[in-house]
Amino acid sequence: MSSSTRVGLKEQLHPLIRDLATGIEATWQRWLNLEPYAAMPADLGYIEGKLEGERLQIENRCYQSREFRKLHLELARVGNNLDILHCVLFPRTTFDLPMFGADLVGGRGQISAAIVDLSPTTIARELSNDYIAGLTALPNPTFQGLRELPTWGDIFSSFCLFIRPGSPEEEAAFLDRALGFLQVHCQQAAAATALTDPEAIATVLEQQRYYCEQQRRNDKTRRVLEKAFGDDWADRYMTTMLFDLPSD
């Protein structure tokens, strides 16, 4: 699929999704030395299918850097009824860093779910003092439509924000907070020193595996993929693109 078509997909999405996608990639470019993701499955960069008669489009943009084995931004659209942004940064297991994750789900001009977090997949199983200081310093507006985390949400931090934005002002405030989280994360990652202790690296690996296993329990995502592409394809997509386990 040509790059012009992929750009066209982003331009069709809800304005908040467009703005967050643009801001995410700009932040990556500012703070990190990006390279193409070496393990990108050749057939999963751009995907089309049908979901209940509606055209389903999925675009995946993936990179890697010194600090992150994968930086993943997924954009998706189902007909005119559903727009999706999904973003996760997977640290290399030689870096004791949390997992940045952000998701937006919208349809018919309304964002129904917006979540952002830095999940403490770290040796101490909590965010470091530097992260806490950086996040605490960000503007922290009040949101009205707070949503309940899923039952498998023990992977999230106390800073996790999960809302249904009720106004353009809340959408703008969420955008600022999500990009603030990402900037703190990229700044901390760029300054981080690689681990050398094998036990510490093994602990980070274990924590990332648990994060991925919990995220794979998201039945809503799996059901959409199964309806559009079948069970086997959905399982492959969940385990190789969305939440692949680290091997390094």
UniProtKB/Swiss-Prot annotation:
The keyword Oxidoreductase applies. Disulfide bonds: none annotated. GO terms for molecular function: cobalt ion binding; phycocyanobilin:ferredoxin oxidoreductase activity. The keyword Repeat does not apply. Keywords: Oxidoreductase. It holds the Pfam family Fe_bilin_red. HAMAP family: Ferredoxin_bilin_red. Belongs to the HY2 family. Catalyzes the four-electron reduction of biliverdin IX-alpha (2-electron reduction at both the A and D rings); the reaction proceeds via an isolatable 2-electron intermediate, 181,182-dihydrobiliverdin. This is Phycocyanobilin:ferredoxin oxidoreductase. It comes from Synechococcus sp. (strain ATCC 27144 / PCC 6301 / SAUG 1402/1) (Anacystis nidulans).
